[in-house]
């Protein structure tokens, strides 16, 4: 785990609070939010979010408000400088990534290219 001064990715209060709420609903305090990147989508790469109980060797862990965000090293290289947030709007509620490394994104924002 690293301190706030050296964090290469921002984990917003809104995202941390939603993770805390979901973990409480699941009644499993070992859960962490994992963000990852896979190939696919209309722009080449897409973001994924899942809950995970374990942290693998090399994973970056960011803690906020008592919950953890976990990123694998391969995904982290594409996410440096980005922000993981949680938004609620007309199109629904979801975790989002604001990624300054993306040169283009699809209309829904779920995939991107570099």
Curated annotation (Swiss-Prot):
Its cofactor is iron-sulfur cluster. Keywords: Iron, Iron-sulfur, Metal-binding. One of its GO terms (molecular function) is 2 iron, 2 sulfur cluster binding. It holds the Pfam family Fe-S_biosyn. Iron-sulfur cluster binds at residues 42, 106, 108. GO terms for biological process: iron-sulfur cluster assembly. GO terms for cellular component: cytosol. Binds 1 iron-sulfur cluster per subunit. InterPro entries: FeS_biogenesis, FeS_cluster_insertion, FeS_cluster_insertion_CS, FeS_cluster_insertion_RrpA, HesB-like_dom_sf. Homodimer. HAMAP family: Fe_S_insert_ErpA. Belongs to the HesB/IscA family. Required for insertion of 4Fe-4S clusters for at least IspG. This is Iron-sulfur cluster insertion protein ErpA. It comes from Haemophilus influenzae (strain ATCC 51907 / DSM 11121 / KW20 / Rd).
């Amino acid at each position: 785990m690293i301190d706030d001064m050296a964090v290469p990715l921002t984990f917003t209060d809104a995202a941390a609070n939603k993770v805390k709420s979901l973990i409480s609903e699941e009644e499993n305090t070992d859960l962490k939010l994992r963000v990852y990147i896979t190939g696919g989508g209309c722009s080449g790469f897409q973001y994924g979010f899942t809950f995970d109980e374990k942290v693998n060797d090399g994973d970056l862990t960011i803690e906020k408000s008592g919950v953890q965000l976990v990123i694998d090293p391969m995904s982290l290289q594409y996410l440096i400088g980005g922000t993981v947030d949680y938004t609620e709007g007309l199109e629904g509620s979801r975790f989002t990534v604001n990624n300054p490394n993306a040169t283009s994104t699809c209309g829904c924002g779920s995939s991107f290219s570099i």
